[in-house]
Amino acid sequence: MATDIATRELRKPVDVAEYLFRRLHEVGIRSVHGVPGDYNLAALDYLPKCGLHWVGNCNELNAGYAADGYARVNGISALITTFGVGELSAINAIAGAYSEFVPIVHIVGQPHTRSQRDGMLLHHTLGNGDYNVFARMNAGVSTTVGRLNDTHEVATLIDNAIRECWIRSRPVYITLPTDMVTKKIEGERLNTPIDLSLPANDPEKEDYVVDVVLKYLHAAQRPVILVDACAIRHKVLQEVHDLMEASGLPTFVAPMGKGAVDETHKNYGGVYAGDGSNTGVREQVESSDLILSIGAIKSDFNTAGFTYRIGQLNTIDFHSTYVRVRYSEYPDINMKGVLRKVIQKLGRVNAQPVPHLSNNLPDDEPKSGDQPITHRWFWPKIGQWLKENDIVITETGTANFGIWETRFPAGVTAISQVLWGSIGYSVGACQGAALAAKEQGNRRTILFVGDGSIQLTLQEISTMIRNKLNPIIFVICNEGYTIERYIHGWEASYNDIQQWDYKSLPVAFGAGKDYKGYRVKTKDDMIKLFENTEFASAPFLQLVELYMPREDAPSALKLTAEAAASRNK
């Protein structure tokens, strides 16, 4: 009776699950990834009425990867798993999203609150009555945990979790017990959108930091801009572009920052990754007397084995929660507001010429013929074939490093997992990215993945077919785990894999007529395929077996692998 009275007092009653899903729709999510399980089934019934499409992945790990890829294109995503077995299958993907600042709302269907209070010995538990253990595991890779156990707190917990996910650009964890799915809460709150705006900087503090930045910038003789992943994740790309335009400064990207700036812009200078950079880029960045570093993540793979040669004394770091000018750090101040004011007050700065970049093939590399396809030839060639606004996904390994040599057309979105580096990630991410692209108007989605990595997650090709997605998948066939070979065990059998008939796999997954597979082994084969207009714009999934020599790898991969091997000794 108490529940009935409480419900009658609500002005606009709404079920908890509906409230949650309508909030997801409000922030731009249109598809939800995950795997059904008995503790989330009742909640899934609410998706259609809330305008959300259920993707239905092959396993939870892949679903997490897909949610990551969807978020990188769409801005935010949602993942639904079931208690224990499902959420722990996904936690690797969630950890990757946490490390790389990708916003995923992870919703976990839980047993009835009564069962939890009584410590019942239910399936999917550890058998010890502890129903909080999995939430504790997820807390370390989530920016907030919202447990929807009390109707009086549910709406606030949901709204706060989604806001934190958006603002901090990291996963959040929400538990939804089976009995809470249909509980009534006040729905009038849905009339007020969640406030997704950044907290304003303290004006006095912000102005002071801006003045300090400008003092050093105006004094510098050879300043440059270096853009990295957190500029993308924390949504300052417009500010980066405006600074690039207003200042005329040479602008470079770190590997994780690929796609952050227009690579056709006259000020774009290339990829800086320490010793992994080309000579002209390395010289200009390392001889600079002031580096405006925006959103840096200075990890091993992002710096070609920690080979950056730029000192903090010549660096101004802009981040989402602080700005560091040389050795002085200013906490609790976000870079977005600071960058805007720097642009407004910029004035004249000393801008050096930018090195000319192109996708020209190396002079000493045979341009065509019946020769094997090499990395030195392939990655610049890809730059000639890509189109504006493509989505380019590269797997950890040869593709991740090879793409550094590709100059993108305007508007390209680059997706990779350079920091977390979970092999197989890119296949699931491709599914999520392709779905987000379809929702936005069918931008091309192109995946480059190794024959070793694809064997971990290839089931998501089935999900691509099921959801009528049309990515172009290049499988680099080079007989195993190349990056591992360069780190340790060149001839070791543990770096070998079983050879598969990759181009036949989509047929096994039910692709039917809406699929085409290719096998290319020479440069002439590749050139002919790139000239094929149907291949460039087919409305269905395509897979290319791309054969490369076993011992071949991008030079930056070799350098980084050597550094990793030395640290492991």
From Swiss-Prot:
InterPro entries noted in UniProt: DHS-like_NAD/FAD-binding_dom, PDC/IPDC-like, THDP-binding, Thiamin_PyroP_enz_cen_dom, Thiamin_PyroP_enz_TPP-bd_dom, TPP_enzyme_TPP-bd, TPP_PDC_IPDC, TPP_PYR_PDC_IPDC-like
UniProt KW keywords: Decarboxylase, Lyase, Magnesium, Metal-binding, Thiamine pyrophosphate
One example GO MF annotation: thiamine pyrophosphate binding
Catalytic activity field: a 2-oxocarboxylate + H(+) = an aldehyde + CO2; pyruvate + H(+) = acetaldehyde + CO2
This protein's record includes keyword Magnesium: yes
Listed EC numbers: 4.1.1.1
Cofactor section: Mg(2+); thiamine diphosphate
Family, as annotated: Belongs to the TPP enzyme family.
Keyword Magnesium set for record: yes
Binding site for pyruvate: D38, H124, E484
Signal peptide, first to last residue: none
Pfam families for the chain: TPP_enzyme_C, TPP_enzyme_M, TPP_enzyme_N
Record's cofactor remark: Binds 1 Mg(2+) per subunit. Binds 1 thiamine pyrophosphate per subunit.
Protein name (record): Pyruvate decarboxylase
Residues reported to bind Mg(2+): D451, N478, G480
CDD domains assigned: TPP_PDC_IPDC (cd02005), TPP_PYR_PDC_IPDC_like (cd07038)
Residues annotated to bind thiamine diphosphate: T398, G421, S422, I423, G452, S453, N478, E479, G480, Y481, T482, I483
GO biological process: aromatic amino acid family catabolic process to alcohol via Ehrlich pathway; glycolytic fermentation to ethanol
Subunit structure of this chain's protein: Homotetramer.
A Gene Ontology term for the protein's cellular component: cytosol
